[in-house]
């Protein structure tokens, strides 16, 4: 058994992070010392590493908590329950990718319509016009029509 500072060091996180995980019921100390300090064990270390790996895959704290609960009572749950969590996350990621692709395409279109000249003022900038909802010059770059 070891104190919070040792667990933080072993996992490469701050003690504040561990307290946050504890507050959000992702981990619980294995016990307390006679003087009241939280004590942790190897199981806690594995839980923290599980949390960190899950976070690196984009899972939310709620999703991680649900997965940890399933892991702790694995014989009472199915792989299908676990897979439903990751499948839902994949669907959300795909939606975000689609939205970001749409945004990138629209931004690239207005960006390409601008000449980007340093010596020209922005009074006829096609990017500003497009963002203001104004008609952008008929395919010409913003500085070419002058």
What residue spans do the PLM features occupy?
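Basic helix-turn-helix/winged-helix DNA-binding cores
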Residues: 1-71
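C-terminal regulatory/oligomerization modules of transcriptional regulators
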Residues: 75-146
């Amino acid at each position: 058994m070891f104190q919070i500072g040792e667990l933080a060091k072993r996992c490469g996180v701050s003690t504040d992070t561990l307290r946050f995980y504890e507050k959000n019921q992702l981990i619980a100390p294995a016990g307390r010392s006679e003087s009241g300090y939280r004590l942790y064990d190897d199981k806690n270390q594995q839980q923290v590493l599980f949390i960190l790996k899950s976070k690196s895959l984009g899972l939310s704290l709620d999703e991680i908590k649900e997965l940890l609960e399933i892991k702790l009572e694995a014989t009472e749950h199915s792989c299908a329950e676990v897979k439903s969590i990751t499948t839902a996350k994949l669907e959300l990621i795909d939606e975000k990718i689609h939205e970001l692709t749409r945004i990138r395409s629209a931004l690239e279109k207005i960006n390409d319509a601008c000449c980007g000249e340093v010596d020209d003022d922005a009074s006829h900038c096609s990017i500003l016009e497009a963002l203001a909802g104004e008609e952008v010059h008929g395919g010409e770059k913003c500085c070419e029509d002058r």
